[in-house]
Regions:
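Short, conserved beta-strand element in jelly-roll/cupin
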Residues: 112-133, 183-186, 191, 215-218
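Double-stranded beta-helix
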Residues: 131-197
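Short, surface-exposed loop/helix-turn segments at secondary-structure junctions
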Residues: 48, 103-108, 112, 164-175, ...
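Non-heme Fe(II)-dependent double-stranded beta-helix
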Residues: 1-11, 16-116, 227
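Non-heme Fe(II)/2-oxoglutarate
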Residues: 38, 196-291
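A short secondary-structure junction signal
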Residues: 98-104, 111-113, 134-140, 149-153, ...
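Short loop segments at secondary-structure junctions
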Residues: 18-20, 128-132, 143-145, 219-220
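Short edge-strand/loop segments of extracellular domains
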Residues: 93, 141-148, 215-221
Length: 291
């Protein structure tokens, strides 16, 4: 486990081979197929670069993978405790789909804590099929969770134009000499620091490539109040632009009791008092490690 921790802290990601049992993998494939069958063309078009982005808040059937009994021991073995769960997504790239844009998934770069060694968010990426560059495997810039890289200068990677893959000539979609392809076998787990620059190759095969990405929050109560409050809003899905006459979409707190009770202990809670909104997706080069 110490070698796993060393590689994770150095590179910002690590692979745990064969994490899912064959039975669990089969069950997740069945659930995933049902969810994907229910997607309409508008969803696929809106998330063309990712393929799909199905929030677990809408799908209590994923409760068991959130509460997988080996997850907390794994994260604790890496040296992390006081763990909460933030969100989960079914991300599935259909055959003949474009690449995913380069991005990182942290937004608290205005805060000094974002430049520490330990992550604020840890992504657990469960792959439901074998992956390689030809079918859209993950690609990463090792070490970019703590070191400045030219790709940090890209525009905000979570806008509509990139999500819809409107300009595939943009360097946000291009290969980079520093990239590493992360090829896995179905059932493997990729652990990733939320600050790591990553994307995915185009899926040039004819088959769907699916994964489940779950975000966990280590040392949660040690986080600054502003970050805690923002994380709680993301969990509750109240951080979205919602019309005044509409309510927020469902969150795991709204799941049926049988599903909710499996994960309640992992729910993030807000700080004791309100704070100003923290949201800065671009790191400060001067505060990152020098290469």
């Amino acid at each position: 486990m110490s070698q796993l921790k060393t590689r994770f802290e150095r590179d910002g990601y690590v692979i745990v081979p064969g994490f899912l049992s064959p039975e669990t993998l089969t069950g997740l494939r069945r659930i995933t197929a049902t969810v994907l069958d229910g997607l309409d063309a508008a969803h696929r078009e809106k998330f063309k670069a990712t393929g799909s982005l199905c929030n677990f808040g809408d799908h209590p059937e994923f409760a068991e993978i959130v509460a997988h009994p080996d997850v907390l021991p794994l994260l604790q073995g890496l040296g992390y405790d006081d763990i909460r769960w933030l969100a989960g997504y079914l991300i599935s790239k259909p055959g003949k789909a474009p690449p995913l844009f380069w991005h990182q998934d942290w937004w608290g770069w205005s805060e000094e804590i974002s430049y520490r060694a330990a992550p604020m968010g840890i992504g657990l990426m469960y792959y439901l099929s074998d992956t390689r560059p030809e079918n859209g495997c993950l690609r990463v810039i090792p070490g970019s969770h703590r070191r400045w890289h030219p790709l940090h200068d890209l525009p905000d990677a979570h806008g509509d134009a990139l999500s819809r893959a409107e300009d595939l000539q943009s360097r946000a979609f291009a290969s980079h000499p520093d990239e590493v392809a992360v090829e896995v076998t179905a059932g493997d787990l990729v652990i990733m620091d939320s600050r790591l620059l990553h994307s995915a190759y185009a899926n040039t095969s004819g088959a769907e490539r699916s994964l489940l990405t779950l975000w966990y929050l280590p040392e949660f109560t040690d986080l600054p109040d502003g970050i805690r409050n923002q994380l709680h809003q993301i969990f509750a899905r109240t951080d979205l632009d919602i019309d005044a006459d509409k309510t927020a979409p469902p969150s795991p707190a709204d799941w049926p009791a049988a599903a909710r009770q499996q994960v309640t202990d992992l729910f993030p809670t807000p700080a004791d008092h309100p704070t100003e909104r923290i949201f800065q997706r671009h790191p400060d080069q001067a505060r990152m490690l020098k290469t």
